[in-house]
Amino acid sequence: MLTNTRLVHGQHDHSRCVDAALSRAEDLCQKKNAKLTPTRATVLSILWQSHRPLGAYQVQDRLSKITGKAIAPPTVYRAIEFLLRLGLIHRLPSLNAYIGCPFPNSEHSNLFMICIECGCVAEIADASLNTRLQTACDKTNFKLHSQNI
């Protein structure tokens, strides 16, 4: 885990991240004939508003504040499941939380650096790591299901 927030994520405009994520989501949904509902889009926006993972109940709280209505947990979980299925977000099991995926259209290892001071998360796609992991699996007759480094 990294402890230097500048290494994890430099200064930038988070609204650009949100806009780019929504644009990628719209494109992907169109290609897969899936519907990006307003609730799903808002949940995705919430997860991209910072580079910190959020739990489902944190997402629920923010969604309720944005809409001005009480949002039931199943509504949030359905949106999260949809976004996970399309690869638009990741679940971080070690934190029981979710974060936006900057590489939804590509096969990649889910390698995350997590700052222990501020909670910032950076995802890294490393093709050589994928290759090494697959080679190790092939040699040992394992099928890669998930990893935690």
Where in the sequence are the language-model features?
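Non-DNA-binding regulatory cores of transcription-related proteins
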Residues: L84-I149
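Short, Lys/Arg-enriched N-terminal segment that forms or immediately precedes the first helix
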Residues: D19-N33
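DNA-recognition alpha helix
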Residues: G55-K69
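Basic amphipathic alpha-helical segments that dock to polyanions
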Residues: L47, V76-L86
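Pre-recognition alpha-helix immediately N-terminal to the DNA-recognition helix
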Residues: A41-I46
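Short helix-capping/hinge SLiMs at alpha-helix to coil transitions
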Residues: K32-A34, W48-H51, I66-T67
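Short helix-coil-helix linker/hinge
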Residues: L36-T39
